[in-house]
Amino acid sequence: MKHKAVKELLRWSLMVFLSVSAVVAVSILMNGMYLLGIPDPEDVRSIVAEYPGVTDEKKEFTDREHVEQAVKLTGFLRYALFEEPVSGGSSMITITYVLDDGRTVSVSADRETVWWKGRPRAIKDREMFVNLAEGIFFLEEVSRP
């Protein structure tokens, strides 16, 4: 009796695992893969935002609101796993996270490609990251004629 209950539990666990795996795989294929390794907002001391096409000034933010927004902004950099990035582009916006331990982590993107850990990847939701970063960090510079 006990052996049969264990078999049923294992069978049920396998079905749950396979179902969850299928849902996650379809979600990644449809919506894109999140960047892995983005720091937690609590571990970030400050961020430096750069937009060379608009201003030569590097903007540093230490307030919690901008730090949290910068970390959350990377959620719009989901990339297509099996799509080749557009070649020949250069980054428009770079966000550098300065961590509490002094290390830095940078992510760069243009409208179609994200550069993360030295590798270019095709952005699934094009335009969104650049538009939001302009509005959050460079609104004054972008709105000038």
Describe the predicted segments one by one:
Residues 2-145:
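Function-determining sites in protein domains
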